[in-house]
Amino acid sequence: MREGSHLIVLPFPGQGHITPMSQFCKRLASKGLKLTLVLVSDKPSPPYKTEHDSITVFPISNGFQEGEEPLQDLDDYMERVETSIKNTLPKLVEDMKLSGNPPRAIVYDSTMPWLLDVAHSYGLSGAVFFTQPWLVTAIYYHVFKGSFSVPSTKYGHSTLASFPSFPMLTANDLPSFLCESSSYPNILRIVVDQLSNIDRVDIVLCNTFDKLEEKLLKWVQSLWPVLNIGPTVPSMYLDKRLSEDKNYGFSLFNAKVAECMEWLNSKEPNSVVYLSFGSLVILKEDQMLELAAGLKQSGRFFLWVVRETETHKLPRNYVEEIGEKGLIVSWSPQLDVLAHKSIGCFLTHCGWNSTLEGLSLGVPMIGMPHWTDQPTNAKFMQDVWKVGVRVKAEGDGFVRREEIMRSVEEVMEGEKGKEIRKNAEKWKVLAQEAVSEGGSSDKSINEFVSMFC
């Protein structure tokens, strides 16, 4: 490999973006590339090496002073992040050149398209990384091109559009930023602007795999130089070729982990409902009470991740009342939980990272989406990949306890449950094949690496 096989990687400063891009770095490092992972932080520290010696983490400031609230104004936040990155990169690139390892490209998050011009200004290639699936990006693309009119509300149920290789969609299946544009005008602009200069990028990377979006892939490849490199799940849960890649980089050795795993070890195979809604979804108190009642009345064992800031919404004396039927924790080792034989289904918000984890580990899912791309992911989870069901919400989005119970029984029992489990196992195998030697994503990663060797 030639000198200078060195890339700068710049994720958007959010865990759902940092995780897949840092996992991609591990795959690239295993192929011989050197990576500098630039992380925007409110408390930047000196650069440091990861477990893999070829990856250097380079924290930089988000542009806010101590005591300032960074997310009070999204436009202000994005502007300061952009300024901080543009002020930092010249010296970083120059230092790399002086060290004898000049960068060849910048791999940047799709929500920061201005980095393409920054890369080209330094004579570097620009590779955009989409942390969302093509099924979502395609919708944003049609909005960007003006070929799709944004509906005024998400609560309509008439068919609105059919995009290339898509099932028919209703407003309730679209990303929330489209149907509630007046509530999220700044975010809508950001997600649509992901496509603003995609026709000029050198390579387009996506955290998905070919078989998962096979029909849609033909369409996007006719437009752009696309390489699917997912799923970006740690290797030891998939192909097992990278023995050190066991987690996303967080310590798993604490009392809460032991509590989770010991509790699961005491349960029969496929008997536990696992619930987690990610790090951002906030349930209203009435929805939390209804969900708690549905779980209790289902009679099923359940492991529920409830953030410490949300526990006050649980019913009074709930933990005592459920006894051994349920375990409520503030955090869980999600990959270990999903891989555990006792898990019968995953009740999820259908964020893309969680959806990919469920698919990769062969776990049937119950989708309870809230915002962003979650409704679209849930639509495909149920109707295209057929690995679960989506709860039926009322007009205002509220989900009744009876619907929670019905969905759990549908996935855990009966003929439909068996078919769902069979499909989940199929996608698990296909995900493993994609990242294994000679698989579609492995070939894509090799092709990407060869551009800089």
From Swiss-Prot:
Protein's name in the database: UDP-glycosyltransferase 74E2
Tissue: Expressed in roots, cotyledons and leaf hydathodes.
Pfam families hit by this protein: UDPGT (PF00201)
Presence of keyword Transferase: yes
Phenotype caused by lack of the gene: No visible phenotype under normal growth condition.
Keyword vocabulary terms for this entry: Glycosyltransferase, Stress response, Transferase
Residues involved in UDP-alpha-D-glucose binding: T131, Q334, H349, W352, N353, S354, E357, D373, Q374
Function according to Swiss-Prot or TrEMBL: Glucosyltransferase that acts on the auxin indole-3-butyric acid (IBA). Mediates abiotic stress responses and stress-induced morphological adaptations by regulating auxin homeostasis. Possesses low activity in vitro on jasmonate (JA) and the synthetic auxin analog naphthaleneacetic acid (NAA).
